[in-house]
Amino acid sequence: TGDALFIGDVGRPDLLASVGVTADELGVMLYDSIQRKLMGLPDAVRVFPAHGAGSACGKNLSTETQSTIGEQRAFNYACQPMSQEEFVAVVTEGQPAAPAYFLYNATLNKQERDVRDLDAAVPALTADQVEAALAAGAVVHDARDVQEFASAHLRGSINVPADGRMAETVGMVFSPEQQVVVIAPEGVEQEVATRFARIGFDHVVGYVADPEAYFLAHEDDVTRASRLTV
C-alpha cells in the first residue's frame, strides 16, 4: 500500500502543499484511495505498507510490518466510515512538522532515478583529498557518538550520530546538493552513506580514513567541547 495506507495510519496529504497542491486537495484524493478503494477490499487481504514507525510520515504509525484490510478497518482511525469532509479534517490536523527534505523527496519520488548500487564502496579519503573537498565547499558530517565528538572534532563539522533517526536529522540540517565528507566509527561509513542516499542525498564524497591521525596532523582545525546535563 506504499505511503497511502500505513498500519494504524494513512499518508500525509500536506507534503506537497508548497508546490501548489493544497493539503485539502490531496486529502480528497487520499479519501478516494482509502475509503473508496482499499476499504472496498475483503478483510482477508494482507497489507504491506512502505514502512512503519520511525519517521514523520504520520502521527500514529505502528511498529508492525504487515496487517490486513480487516484489522485496519477495525483499528485504524482513518479507515472508519466517515464523510469526505470529516476524513480530510482528521488526517490534516495534528501532524508533526515536516522535515525540510520531505518536499524534496516527494518531488524526487515522481522522477526516474538510477538504482543505487549498495555494494559500491564509499571512498576512503586521504588527508589531501579531505582538504581538497573542504576547500571546494564540502561539509563534514561526524557520525560518532556525542562524547567522542565533544572530545575532538573538526571545526564546523556537524554531529549527527549514526544510531537513532540519523537520516531524518541530517535531512533537516544538510541540503541535498551539498558535498559531504563523513567521519564515522570504523565499519559504519557505508551505512552512513546509504542512509543519506535513502533520502535522496547522493553527494557523500567519502570518509576520513583515520580521524585520529587527521586530527593530530591538523590540530589548528580541531576543537573540543564540554557537555552539560540538564
What is each of the regions a protein language model found here?
Residues 12-14, 20, 24-27, 71-114, ...:
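Rhodanese-like catalytic fold shared by cysteine-dependent sulfurtransferases
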Residues 1-95:
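Metallo-beta-lactamase
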